[in-house]
Amino acid sequence: MHGVDLHTHSNISDGTLSPEQLVHAAVEKGIHTLALTDHDTMDGLKLAEKVALDLPLNIISGVEISSQWSRPATQKSYGVHIVALNMQNSEPLQILLEQQKQIRAIRAKQICDLLIPLIGQDIYADVIAKVDGIADRITRTHIAKTLVEKKIVNRPQQAFDKYIKEGKKAYVKFDGLGLEETIKVIHASQGY
């Protein structure tokens, strides 16, 4: 199969492969154009680009940005993920991604704290170990996988359904930038 993959995640966010491994896996599968679109970070991009230099693979810079869309008619806010491609480094982008990292780290600790009375143990140290001690890389997927490893649930989706999705006792909203502001940052970074 030859093709393009414009939405991938490495283990810098909630993927399973390192950026370097992801590049090699893409080439093995016949992919010729790959966008690394980790959640709220572009930290893996240089690693992927370096490996791809000697391979038949075009890397497109990208990021999946967590944002909020407010529906005026209901005053309700919804979390949305925007896959932004062809991103160039800009000051607004650096500021946004740094804010997102801080929000992500705080949210992960809050979720783990809310889980303590529900599961009878603190799993934060185990979760942070999954991301090499870098708290701002933690996603709910890491928390769900830890709950599976601890045999609290049987599969990651069960962790979401029982504890960490919206409406459940350990859910914490990702309070990111609004949709319009996020799009402005993407455009300021020559992205689309």
Please state what every model-predicted region is.
Residues 1-77, 162-169, 173, 177-192:
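An N-terminally biased module of ancient metal coordination in phosphate/nucleic-acid-related enzymes
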Residues 45, 96-111:
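Charged, low-complexity, helix-prone segments enriched in Lys/Glu/Asp/Gln
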Residues 70-99, 103, 126, 149-168:
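Active-site gating loops and adjacent loop-to-helix segments of metal-dependent hydrolytic enzymes
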Residues 15-16, 105-110, 118-192:
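Divalent metal-binding pocket/active-site signature
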Residues 56-64, 93-99, 128-138, 164-165:
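Short charge-dense sequence patches
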Residues 63, 84-88, 119:
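Generic hydrophobic/packing signal
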